[in-house]
Amino acid sequence: MLEAATPPGGDIVKSVTGTLDVKYRFSYGEQYDRFFREMRDNKRIMGIACPKCGAVLLPPRPYCGFCYTPVDEWVELSDEGALLTYTVVHLPFIGQPTEPPYIYAFIMLDGADVQFPHILGEIEAADVRTGMRVKAVWAEERKGTLHDIKYFRPV
């Protein structure tokens, strides 16, 4: 339920407090389409390489985020990498990939120049260390989303 906040002596609503459920549809576009199809159909993580600065971007995008050059060279990345940082999520919120508590991490996949966010599994939070090697665990049934990778586990 929404509640309008009316200032004293005025009739102008300056803010509204409440919760809105917003439904939307996001179009993948050319780069995301191939990225998610490759994960779904081939268990492959694809990046895109910049011809000017050489950066390998993940997820793929039409322009390099470092030098703003158009990019179109696809490269297959490893499904292994190094854990750069992480946090333990304790509070529930809409759209979570799993029930809390869980470990949310930023991973630098081998061959990529951009961090890949995902969850960690098969490990307790007390045992997680930055720099540790991790590997993707693929979902049995893949649908063309980030959840095609169930989680990353220690190598």
What spans do the regions from the language model cover?
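A broadly conserved sequence feature marking short terminus-proximal activation segments
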Residues: 2-45, 154-155
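Well-ordered alpha/beta subsegment
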Residues: 17, 116-155
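Residues immediately within or flanking Cys/His clusters that coordinate Zn2+
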Residues: 44-47, 61
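Short, cysteine/histidine-rich loop/knuckle motifs that typically chelate Zn2+
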Residues: 49-52, 63-69
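Cys/His-rich microdomains that often coordinate metals
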Residues: 56-57, 70-71
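Short coil-to-beta-strand transition motifs
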Residues: 73-82, 128-132
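Glycine-rich active-site loops that engage anionic ligands at enzyme catalytic sites
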Residues: 84-121, 125
